[in-house]
Amino acid sequence: MRPVYAVSGGVSKFAKARPDKTFPALVKEAYDYALDDLGLTHRQFLEIVDGSVASYFSDHFARQLMAAIMAQDYLGLCPKPSHRVEGGGATGGICFQEAWKAIASGYMDVCLAYGFETMSHVATWKGNEFIALASDVSTDYPVGGFYSGYYAMMVTRHMKEFGTTPEQMAHVSVKNHMNAYHNPYAQKRQKLSIADVRNAPMVAWPLTRLDICVMSDGAAATVLCSEEGLAKLEKASGQRIPRVRVTGIGRGTDAMRMADRPHQSYDDFLKYNLLPNEDTPETRAYYQDLWDRGFRYPGIHSFRAGRMGSKEAYKHAGIADPLAEIDFVELHDAYTSSEIQTYEDMGLCRYGEGGAFAASGKAFMPSVDYGLDLADKPACPVNPSGGLIACGHPVGATGLMQAVFAIWQLQHTIGKHFEDDTLQVSNAKRGAIHSHAGTGTYVTVSILEKED
């Protein structure tokens, strides 16, 4: 496999509705941003780019079949090769990794990955119905299943087994909204308190409206390349491009229905799901105690796909201790509860300790005043962009939005793009992006690193 670099990215402004632009025009907004950051015109880029990968979640939201080819044509990239990917909420993350594969395999030297969603064409209730179609339509959907209900069920089990509290979940919401306050591309730039989150309208107990991501219109685009492609881009732009290398990718899957997921024995958990930083006598004993008391993995409250994706990505990137070796994470926080669950499955803390980790301060930015009394200093900021909860969740763009913000963090250009360096992770050298579908059916994890 060849080295792969993520050299540029652009995003549109995320909003509840963007009636000013069609979905191809939103993609062009992000595409133009990415090219401008490279110092290239469309004509120059067209001579260099080999093809693209497109990402959008739902034909229903787009109100258009084959919407990706319309965006490809609008960008002026025909007849270059392209294909569309779809994987629920993980669609953008899959798109990024498909572009990586095109470069790593030698099929392309320069590949554009772009994604979009326009969710404002329908009322929120209808949008929730469309999203619910990404569950089992033979069993779950007909009896009124919807995603906020699924996640409420998962977190109540997590609360029962591990003592996780609604206040710990609210810490995630406060953190992500306060981060988004400093992100000019974010949809919800609000300053919140724990009380604000808990007193918001209840959607599905214990999840309030401020525990849940928002529907959005938006687009994002990234440019990935090989060493040869990088040389072509630099020659055309006449400038050196800061190197950000994609050093690891991982994916995982699980059954659509949570009840269909097997409960692993202690030995099988150690064999298949133990992360590298967990292979210590102390942590093995901790897990043995959980199993002795009747706990199982993944249960209905954990994401085995996320653990598998993390394990694969860490293996490729040579990461032994994610909390110590990763400088920031852009994580798929569709719900505050799912961010807590994902802390555990990415190895930022142990299985069952996500709630305490959320309220500890370790996932917070050191440069933001959250108005909270936090016991620990920041260790690995999670969702410095504001995440899905506050920055927005235009599904097909979301995983690519994470990649764009990660690229800017590692190029140390957050201050340039945001006109405010509050959210710049100091001396960031390595970041992770995490994209998640369904109740953990598809998950991607990618590791990006600054290369001098």
Provide a role label for each language-model segment.
Residues 1-90, 98, 158-166, 187-188, ...:
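Conserved active-site "lid/cap" helical segment
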Residues 381-407, 414, 423-430, 436-439:
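Gly/Ser/Thr/Ala-enriched C-terminal appendages of enzymes
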Residues 43-56, 81-87, 111-116, 167-174, ...:
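Beta-strand segments within the central parallel beta-sheet cores of soluble alpha/beta enzyme folds
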Residues 59-67, 255-263, 332-356, 364-373, ...:
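Short glycine/threonine-rich loop-to-helix capping motif typified by GTGT followed
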